[in-house]
Amino acid sequence: MRVAVVYSRGLAGLDAPLVRVEAHVGGGLPQFRIVGLPDTEVKEARDRVRAALNTSRFEFPDGRVTVNLEPADLPKESGRFDLPIAIGILAASHQIPARELANLEFAGELGLSGDLRAIRGALAMTFGAHRDGRTLVITESVAAEASLAPGAMILPARSLLDV
């Protein structure tokens, strides 16, 4: 059993509540499930994440992959969770070291090529990450907005490979 935990942020008005992304890679028939997103968002995120991992020269794990986004009662919309889902899968499948993730938060929509796309709420997410003592890894296209937060700790990236 392999489990990894990655942190991200939702968006609720001007607030950006913490979202814990748990990724589990286990044996069994190949299956990729995401729990905690509306059905349409789940299908779209699954397709984007799988394609981005493959085109970025990572291996999508064989077997059963389950991702849980919590808290379950927090509305989760848009592709902002693509990057943390991908990072969680990579850590749970031992393609990247999980120990380095504890002080980081991730947000970004993935294109099928692995490029990161802009998301809304970068400033609010940066404030939340800073308040919790973490560095925010975010798409380069919104890094200027995120850097407006005093004491902001951000790492801009253009693609999954940059991360």
Segments the model singles out, each with a brief description of its role:
Residues 1-163:
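Peripheral, non-AAA+ core regions of ATP-driven protein-machinery
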